[in-house]
Regions:
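Terminal interaction module
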Residues: 1-77, 84-86, 114-275
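Short, charged beta->alpha transition segments
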Residues: 92-98
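Broad gene-expression machinery/nucleic-acid interaction feature
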Residues: 95, 106, 166
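Short, solvent-exposed beta-alpha or beta-beta edge segments that form flexible loop/patches at the rim
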Residues: 82-92
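Glycine-rich, often proline-containing surface loops adjacent to acidic residues and nearby aromatics
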Residues: 99-110
């Protein structure tokens, strides 16, 4: 049976250390929710206009919405009255569906080549739309929409290594509620307090703890950050660098599946990555 491919992304609303005095102190989940409900619009210099609509909630914090663009296009039509073929200027509005979970900032973007060549293009437009939201503007939040990489290849190399000599991971300001307590969560607070957008921390040693490195690597992937390491793959071998890389994690869902079912599959796949 044919299916639709959904790509996993993480949206972050990173609040500044000093919030505007006249605006309520909203959580990232609340900012996410308000931004969706505003149904913002985005005009590009190319003349195309992007929209967010068709918002449907499954509960208070999960649901789906449509994102698409409107452009002027020339349609070739047959005019029965004149008996001639004519060119008629009309609007074209391709769109795709996105399922979401505001609790953890999780997105599942449906692939649709008629709208964009890849999910990354759609993700950039989602970020642009959220940046136009009055709630985002008033809170001064920075919006990030990044794909969730599959960490399994990286983790397999970590598990099989003779020794882990160094480990490096990036972090951003606080947002993900499920960030690990050891690395991502405290460093994200540090980034916010010092006024940094992003940061990276590298640790080195003769043989780093494999279980801790694996745990932080999973959290790093789930929060849409990046990681790298230097390992000795086998005894007597030279140190080599490895990186967590690849495309967004994706799932294929049957065409007749409801959007609730789609979100459930997205959440299950996210849990696999998070570990």
């Amino acid at each position: 049976m044919a299916g639709t491919e959904y790509y996993l992304y993480r949206v972050k609303f990173i609040k500044p250390a000093q919030m505007p005095l006249l605006f309520p102190n909203l959580s990232p989940s609340q900012i996410f929710l308000e931004a969706i409900n505003e149904k913002p619009e985005l005009m590009l210099s190319s003349g195309s206009e992007w929209h967010l609509g068709n918002v449907d909630f499954f509960d208070q914090l999960t649901g789906s919405f449509a994102i698409g663009r409107t452009t002027k296009t020339t349609l070739e039509k047959f005019d029965k009255e004149s008996g001639n073929f004519i060119d008629k200027l009309d609007d074209s509005s391709p769109y795709t569906t996105v399922v979401f979970d505001c609790r953890i900032g999780l997105l599942g973007i449906a692939k649709k080549s008629k709208l964009a060549p890849d999910a990354e293009t759609v993700a950039r437009r989602i970020r642009g739309l959220f940046e136009k939201s009055e709630t985002v503007i008033n809170t001064g939040a920075e919006v990030k929409v990044n794909f969730i990489p599959d960490p399994q290849g990286f983790i397999q190399k970590i598990r099989g290594a003779y020794a882990i000599k160094s480990f490096k991971a990036t972090f951003t300001g606080p947002n993900p509620v499920d960030a690990d307590e050891l690395f991502q969560k405290p460093l994200s607070v540090y980034a916010q307090q010092i006024g940094a957008r992003t940061g990276a921390l590298e640790v080195k040693g003769e043989a780093l703890n494999e279980e801790v490195v694996e745990s932080v690597a999973k959290s790093t992937a789930a929060t849409a950050n990046t990681a790298s390491a230097r390992i000795i793959p086998e005894e007597g071998k030279k140190v080599i660098p490895i990186k967590m890389k690849g495309d967004a994690v994706s799932v294929v869902v049957n065409l007749d599946a409801s959007y609730r079912d789609v979100l459930e599959r997205i959440q299950e796949e996210y849990s696999r990555v998070r570990g």
